[in-house]
From Swiss-Prot:
<comment type="function">
    <text>Plays a negative role in salicylic acid (SA)-mediated resistance to powdery mildew (e.g. Golovinomyces cichoracearum). May modulate plant immunity by regulating the relocation of EDR1 by interacting with CHC2 and modulating endocytosis.</text>
</comment>
<dbReference type="InterPro" id="IPR055126">
    <property type="entry name" value="EDR4-like_N"/>
</dbReference>
<feature type="region of interest" description="Disordered">
    <location>
        <begin position="292"/>
        <end position="336"/>
    </location>
</feature>
<feature type="compositionally biased region" description="Basic and acidic residues">
    <location>
        <begin position="565"/>
        <end position="577"/>
    </location>
</feature>
<dbReference type="GO" id="GO:0005768">
    <property type="term" value="C:endosome"/>
</dbReference>
<keyword id="KW-0175">Coiled coil</keyword>
<feature type="compositionally biased region" description="Polar residues">
    <location>
        <begin position="296"/>
        <end position="314"/>
    </location>
</feature>
<keyword id="KW-0967">Endosome</keyword>
<keyword id="KW-0254">Endocytosis</keyword>
<dbReference type="GO" id="GO:0009863">
    <property type="term" value="P:salicylic acid mediated signaling pathway"/>
</dbReference>
<feature type="compositionally biased region" description="Polar residues">
    <location>
        <begin position="119"/>
        <end position="129"/>
    </location>
</feature>
<dbReference type="InterPro" id="IPR021480">
    <property type="entry name" value="Zinc_ribbon_12"/>
</dbReference>
<keyword id="KW-0611">Plant defense</keyword>
<feature type="compositionally biased region" description="Polar residues">
    <location>
        <begin position="63"/>
        <end position="89"/>
    </location>
</feature>
<feature type="region of interest" description="Disordered">
    <location>
        <begin position="46"/>
        <end position="271"/>
    </location>
</feature>
<dbReference type="GO" id="GO:0030100">
    <property type="term" value="P:regulation of endocytosis"/>
</dbReference>
<dbReference type="GO" id="GO:0006897">
    <property type="term" value="P:endocytosis"/>
</dbReference>
Length: 615
């Protein structure tokens, strides 16, 4: 069909959301209005009408009946006016061509009026494909019937021509007038055999109708192919072979396209080097297209308008480069396709990219394979030759520092969660040996991750928590099992600490509390080390004084009695009497608590007498 501007528009189906889109002839790249997927238009090559080859000629001659070679030398005579009757097959063929053209135009009009909604449009096109498939079967039966009828007519005409003797020019003119749709001219000297061969060539070179194309598309189980009435059978076979369901998912990681014919094109060495340099320098500008995901409700996008005006965006150029680099004949092999694809993507964390065939039964695990290289490219440094799992395992098992605590090796905390293909122990230890790795180019700056958090594997974390909990339990048990010691309160005695030193062995002794309770002139205390009896006296019940003077006086008295034995007898009872008086227990007055606090009676407590209590 043709639009108002004279451009050919082709209806295609989005390989991702199965939505019917209109594809212009001069727009190579466009965007789906349903899923916002960027698609690449299939390059249209009009197949030239080729002349019949030698193989087709031999094949046509092999299918001829044996009675045909007898009439090869038939010549046209000017004297005889034998008229070749117009074969009924020609008129039937002409009517068939008219009917086919009318049906083709009606089909194209119906396809043009289809709604672009997700549900209704898909159901209507499926119903039309089923109906067109049935009509295509009927047409095939009609074609076979017409071909057999034409063969019989040509054979009969050849037989009648041989019996009559010759064919005139008028026969050829009448036959040519009865077949206006033919593409090959019939010479005046042409025989019925050549005429039949030309008819077969016309049928072979004839462009298939929309019924044939739609029926061929309906036979595809995936339902994601394009609907193109201008495509030749060779291009149909090629498109079926190039369909993503029959290929690996690694060839479709770079960009999402409806055709892969541009993959065969190669970049020059200078262009490839410039592309890689721009990838490393990080000149991607995603802020130019903030509304990338919000451009729905239309079958085309500003990409097509820019192409019409001659404007080529930066991201579009890099998309074409990614397609050329990732082609089956590209300079990069299968190992480097995914790495270059991830580098061509803008260097931004959490880039919003969806899988090419999400929801397709033929690619159930494509999202998993897509997430792993994305986390790998975001978190790990970029290398010229890439880094595989075997290299990481080798570094982990052969590096003595990597098997240790892994000090100084810090990477992002998101890496262990996103990258499910590696376990955290390898990631935690493999980063410590990046500076000494031969894979790292010397001119590349040192890699510093943006998140400063140490990664610890789940096993190590569990062991640490278990050891910490066990240590806490041991400390709690030790505190519980500790023997409870009785609390001993030390009260001050005589205005100070109740501790004295022995006179003979200098051992620290503690004074008992009853020194203040009992009102005596002298208090006796025996040392537990040297068994020496110490005598103390209290002065004003605030100062503790050792009673040594009494011993000196006793010695002097003993010396004086030895000198005068007469005076010795009366002196002894006095000394004994005085010692007995000193050791007499005073009369208890008041409560012991009051005496301990320095009060002898209760009245002193109320009167708050400034006078010290009597002894």
């Amino acid at each position: 069909m043709a639009s108002q501007t004279g451009q050919k528009i082709r209806l295609v189906r989005c390989p991702k959301c199965l939505k019917i889109l209109q594809e212009d002839e001069d727009v190579p790249v466009y965007q789906c209005g349903g899923c916002s997927a960027i698609l690449q238009a299939k390059r249209r090559n009009i197949a030239p009408s080729s002349t019949p080859s030698a193989g087709e000629t031999e094949r046509a001659q092999a299918n001829e009946p044996q009675s045909v070679p007898e009439t090869n030398n038939v010549s046209s005579s000017s004297g005889q006016d034998t008229v070749l009757p117009s074969s009924p097959g020609r008129s039937v063929d002409q009517e068939y061509e008219k009917g086919r053209n009318a049906s083709m135009e009606s089909t194209e009009k119906e396809l043009d009026d289809l709604e672009l909604s997700n549900g209704d449009g898909t159901n209507e096109i499926q119903e039309q494909e089923c109906s067109l498939g049935d009509s295509e079967k009927n047409e095939r039966e009609d074609n076979s019937r017409l071909e057999s009828h034409m063969m019989n007519t040509v054979a009969e005409a050849a037989g009648s021509g041989s019996s009559s003797g010759s064919l005139s020019v008028d026969h050829v003119v009448a036959a040519r007038a009865s077949n206006p749709s033919g593409n090959s001219e019939i010479s005046p000297d042409a025989s019925p055999v050549e005429e039949k061969q030309s008819q077969l060539d016309i049928l072979a070179n004839k462009t298939p109708s929309a019924y044939d194309v739609v029926a061929a598309r309906a036979s595809n189980s995936s339902g994601n192919a394009e609907i193109s009435p201008d495509a030749s059978p060779v291009e149909e076979k090629q498109s079926q072979l190039d369909y993503p369901a029959n290929k690996t998912s690694s060839a479709y990681d770079g960009s999402e396209s409806s055709s892969d014919e541009r993959e065969g094109q190669l970049l020059d060495d200078d262009e490839q080097w410039n592309a890689l340099q721009k990838i490393r320098s990080g000149k991607f500008e995603m802020h130019r297209y903030p509304g990338y995901k919000e451009q729905g409700a239309s079958s085309s996008s500003p990409f097509s308008e820019n192409r019409r005006n001659g404007i080529t965006t930066y991201n579009e150029r890099h998309q074409n480069r990614s397609l050329q680099l990732e082609g089956p004949g590209g300079r990069l092999g299968r190992q480097g396709r995914r790495h270059v694809t991830e580098q061509l993507r803008p260097d931004m964390p959490f880039y919003p990219r969806e899988s090419y065939t999400r929801g397709s039964p033929s690619h159930p695990s494509h999202d998993e394979f897509d997430r792993y290289p994305r986390a790998h490219s975001l978190q790990m440094p970029s290398y010229a030759g890439g880094m595989n799992h075997d290299f990481v395992d080798y570094m982990y098992h052969n590096n003595p520092r990597a098997r240790g605590q892994g000090q100084g090796s810090r990477i992002s905390g998101e890496m262990g969660r996103n990258h499910g293909g590696w376990y955290s122990g390898q990631l935690h230890n493999s980063y410590s040996s990046y500076s000494a790795s031969p894979q790292r180019p010397m001119e590349q700056p040192e890699y510093h991750p943006r998140w400063r958090r140490e990664i610890v594997s789940d096993v190590e974390d569990h062991q640490r928590n278990r050891h910490a909990g066990h240590h806490h339990e041991l400390q709690t048990r030790r505190l519980r099992e500790r023997q409870r010691v009785a609390k001993r309160h030390v009260r001050p005695t005589a205005g100070g600490a109740p501790f004295v030193s022995c006179y003979s062995c200098s051992e620290n002794l503690q004074l008992p509390v009853d020194f203040l309770i009992f009102k005596r002139k002298h208090h006796l205390l025996r040392c537990g080390t040297c068994t020496t009896v110490l005598r103390f006296s209290l002065q004003s019940r605030n100062h503790l004084v050792p009673a040594v003077t009494h011993d000196i006086n006793a010695n002097r008295n003993s010396n004086s009695t030895s000198e005068s034995p007469i005076d010795k007898a009366p002196s002894k009872p006095e000394k004994l009497r005085s010692s007995v008086q000193d050791e007499e227990l005073p009369v208890a007055r008041g409560s012991p608590l009051h005496r301990l606090m320095g009060y002898s009676t209760v009245s002193q407590v109320f009167k708050v007498s400034q006078r010290p209590p009597s002894i």
